[in-house]
Amino acid sequence: AHMLEPRVRALVSDRVADASLRDAVTELTRVIQPLTLSTDSSDPGDDSATTGTDRTETAAGADAETIRAELADADVTLEDLERVRAFYADLRDELDRRVTDHLDATRPDWRASGSDETDRDVPLRDPTEPGRDEISAWAERAGYGDRVWTCAPAVGAVVERALDAIADTDARYTAPGVGRTIAAWHHEDHTTFFRAIRLEDAHDETAPADSWRRTHAASLALYNCLPSAAIGDRLAAFGGGVLMSATLEPMDVFREVTGLDHLAAQGRPVVEQTHGLPFPPENRASFAVDAPKFTHANRGAPGEETETRLAYVDATARVAACDGNVLVGTPSYTEARWMATALEERLDKPVLLDESSDDRETESLKASFFEGGDKVLVTSLRGTLTEGVDYSGDRLAAAVVCGVPIINTEAPRTRAVIAAYDRRFSEGFETALTVPAVRKARQAVGRVIRGADERGIRVLLDARYARRSWNDVRGYVPAHEREEFQPVTPDMLEVALEQFDASG
């Protein structure tokens, strides 16, 4: 449950793909064409013989009657259909122009080099300042007013029903979904929602050689930065439920961002229960190491031998040298590669590296870690091996968290989320980024002790866990855990580890 809000945020966001706009235009044409053929047809003057043209016009006439009936029921006109079709076609052209301009500005050689395999968001407004997006402004300049946006869902529904009727098939159509997203784009506010062009790696050999569509896929993305109301509305559909995790605190933040306060405001009872760790405290050693803050400014690039990097390798190697399997979590896969290489030079035991991969490779790596003698597994704290994995028994003797795994704050969508949370809570960075990062760190060290008879070592390696400062995170660790994670200096870590080993 601790990841409910960040994971659901994507599910309650919308997007309309370039290809979907293309397909919606095609579907609209299939509905419009019989109406125009029926209107333009005339009596040939000789009904003694039936020609191919006659049969086409007869079929078009029958289809036209069916479509007119659907239009009448939905209060949608032929003019609405034609206007929405023109809007989608022009919108696709505008998307094409903007993607081309973006690639020309950021990667002038993109036509020759192809995709750089990097997905990105191209913001349509300043992410830090809520305001009208550039697509909405373009539409107004192009003469597309409220009507074309607001009637898009009804037009999409008519297209679906009409094509079902005249095609006599049970196909899935694009126009309804496009219409709903287009309407949401128009009516949703500009603080809760952030609008951008989503550009992703793709390969389409049928696209023109000089088109970005050959190597990229683009969509108009409507990101929900504050999904609490949407989550609350969905939770309200249930008679009751339990949201459970060992890392929900701080509870006031969790209640707000997951929609529980939204439910409570509607009169639904929301009850909190907190349970301590039932295992003997003498079986676990928990340390918050006062090492230099593992920020990019302090540590430098992975190839640099800075004092900060040296301190982290030294401390991590001390823990990793302990008997048993050791899990090491870093803020990113790039840092994981660096740490794994550094540990291989220091340790006698095998060092396994988890890289961003598919489920099969991850399961294979996990099996290798569990089999045989003592090993070290280095991974990203944003991966899947630091939470939700069973390390019970002798599978894990220690876990080390290096730094606070705060996500990239330069990404446009992240900056928009921070700005939205700033306006809701006044502490957007802490609510949107710091609290989830600390939860991930706590999840990682929580892999160690899974039963009453297990012993293990838990290490939070960063001064921000150890002592108060302007950007510390110690206050986001629950009080009962803060008492256990006693601050130690890097020099005293080895002594503390030896004392714990002797106590067993």
Whereabouts are the PLM-identified features?
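Conserved coupling segment at the C-terminus of the helicase ATP-binding
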Residues: 1-308, 313-326, 331-334, 338-345
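Beta-sheet entry/capping signal
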Residues: 239-243, 268-272, 286, 325-327, ...
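Short secondary-structure boundary/capping segments
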Residues: 250-251, 255-265, 342-346, 392-397, ...
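A generic structural motif
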Residues: 267-277, 350-362, 483-500
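Short, charged, surface-exposed secondary-structure boundary motifs
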Residues: 281-284, 359-366, 408-415, 488-496
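Conserved RecA-like P-loop NTPase helicase motor core
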Residues: 290-302, 361-464
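Conserved C-terminal RecA-like helicase domain
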Residues: 311, 343-368, 372
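N-terminal targeting/trafficking signals and adjacent low-complexity tails
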Residues: 460-504
